[in-house]
């Protein structure tokens, strides 16, 4: 959520900026009307509260002197209903204003390129050289079919479309990838491993920005009166660990990593990537989350992105680093780097990691703060998140980049200790 003072003091300028950089239309007239009404009701409420307080004080003084207070009590009773109604009206209009604020996306940093969509993203760097094959290559679906490793038919029987059953060596490779990533981030990058719930409440999703705007993207479950949601990323669970917390300065930065199942409805995918495992309803991801002081978030963003890059480099997978434009960034992000891995069957790079600095946007929604050691006062933290990386897509990239003419897969050297020394599967 943006700083409310922007809505109150710089509304026209904010609306123009949001339209230009985010393509988001803010109804200025409606918001001005709401704010004007809020001020009117608030002034009226405060006047009545002040009157109540003065009358209550007078009643107390009169009673202490043994005087009759019935007239004063009657005066209080005369406006108490008005005060109660005014307080309710004030709360209602504050809720309306908050609903508007919760739907407004974060503002990009000044160095984020202006653009409408992914075509305006800017490539920052490349690593590795795509392999040249001397045989007809297969995509991951064909490679999986050769050995019965990827079973979409059984998954469809169990759950429907966009699910896959992994069998045998490929299931083992998938597990090895996740374990290897976790070990790297914990042992070499200094992240704390955290095992988090994959079912969360609505407050958690409000905190990180999935609700109320993106509810259609979420799977949910209802038990009695309690509605819960399956996480689309463990960023949700990890980041909300600091919700309503005040963190001492010497504990920052907090760096956490989790390997979890993730669930997405893919409501807006428009039929894209229906073949294979590129876009699934259920998938696994190793997620990185950092919580830091505001002055440290830019450096932390570069560090986190570099940690994700290291995963691809240790696997020997060619990739490129992309700076997202204003129109392609996520709702809560103020700056995002995507990492795209090379897929030989498609002859192109595909997203495998997205690393975002959210500034104080999520922290304000969560009331996540740190205690400034100089002033002694609580201030909003900055939050960052990044895939370190998507496990299923990493498996696809390994299958395709390490395939052999006979349909077997060479196991990357770094994964062999996790697979009892196997150098090849299939």
UniProtKB/Swiss-Prot annotation:
Query: Which InterPro entries does UniProt cross-reference here?
Result: aa-tRNA-synt_IIb, aa-tRNA-synth_II, aa-tRNA-synth_II/BPL/LPL, Ser-tRNA-ligase_type_1, Ser-tRNA-synth_1_N, SerRS_1_N_sf, SerRS_core, tRNA-bd_arm
What EC number is given for this enzyme?
Answer: 6.1.1.11
**Pathway recorded for this protein:** Aminoacyl-tRNA biosynthesis; selenocysteinyl-tRNA(Sec) biosynthesis; L-seryl-tRNA(Sec) from L-serine and tRNA(Sec): step 1/1
Q: Which reaction does it catalyse?
A: tRNA(Ser) + L-serine + ATP = L-seryl-tRNA(Ser) + AMP + diphosphate + H(+); tRNA(Sec) + L-serine + ATP = L-seryl-tRNA(Sec) + AMP + diphosphate + H(+)
Q: Where does L-serine bind?
A: 233-235, 287, 387
Record-level GO BP terms:
selenocysteine biosynthetic process; seryl-tRNA aminoacylation
Q: Describe the family membership recorded for this protein in Swiss-Prot or TrEMBL.
A: Belongs to the class-II aminoacyl-tRNA synthetase family. Type-1 seryl-tRNA synthetase subfamily.
Q: PANTHER family, per this entry? A: SERINE--TRNA LIGASE, SERYL-TRNA SYNTHETASE
Q: What does this protein do?
A: Catalyzes the attachment of serine to tRNA(Ser). Is also able to aminoacylate tRNA(Sec) with serine, to form the misacylated tRNA L-seryl-tRNA(Sec), which will be further converted into selenocysteinyl-tRNA(Sec).
The protein in question is named Serine--tRNA ligase
Q: Which organism is it from?
A: Xylella fastidiosa (strain Temecula1 / ATCC 700964)
Tell me the name of the encoding gene. Answer: serS
